[in-house]
Amino acid sequence: MPASFVSDPARRVEIARTILSQLPEWFGIPAATEEYITDAAREPCFVYEKDGAPVGFLCLKETGHSTVELAVMGVLKSCHRKGYGRALVDAAAAYARQMGYEFMQVKTVQMGKYEEYDRTNRFYLSCGFKEFEVFPTLWDDWNPCQIYVLSLNK
């Protein structure tokens, strides 16, 4: 089943809150998590549902005329490694291409710092993202920011 676009802003917020509240390993800073949730009302978002319930979502944010950022993504831990995350990335990339974007970027904690984020890094690499740049202190000294980029030109 493919991921689907969520047009209703209130539904996007509800989905973001439901998923992110269950992922404290990745979204453990309450103020930052709340910002992701409120931003979902204004951003293009996609959901993956299983048996009628959301198990994953992804929101995009424009960062330049040619580039869109995968601003936030979450998939319930019990649903990892089942293809739902890839379906979300594929749907978002197709949408971004249709909207005329050439690149998609994503930020995460650099590989080698935390096992949870190492899995996240490997996921993005498996989706075709390429390492672009690391900002060692963008977030703080303990969480170097790795930027990956995906070419949307096929």
Outline where the language-model segments fall:
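Short hydrophobic/aromatic beta-strand or adjacent loop that forms the aromatic wall/cage
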Residues: 43, 143-148
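Conserved beta-strand in the GNAT
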Residues: 47, 53-61, 67-74
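Conserved active-site tyrosine of GNAT-family acetyltransferases
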Residues: 124, 129
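Short glycine/proline-centered loop/turn elements that form peptide/ligand docking sites
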Residues: 115-120, 134-144
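Conserved acetyl-CoA binding element of GNAT-fold acetyltransferases
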Residues: 66-77, 86, 105-107
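Conserved GNAT acetyl-CoA-binding A-motif
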Residues: 96-116
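Conserved acetyl-CoA pyrophosphate-binding loop and the N-cap/start of the following alpha-helix
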Residues: 79, 83-91
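Short amphipathic alpha-helix that is part of the acyltransferase structural core
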Residues: 1-31
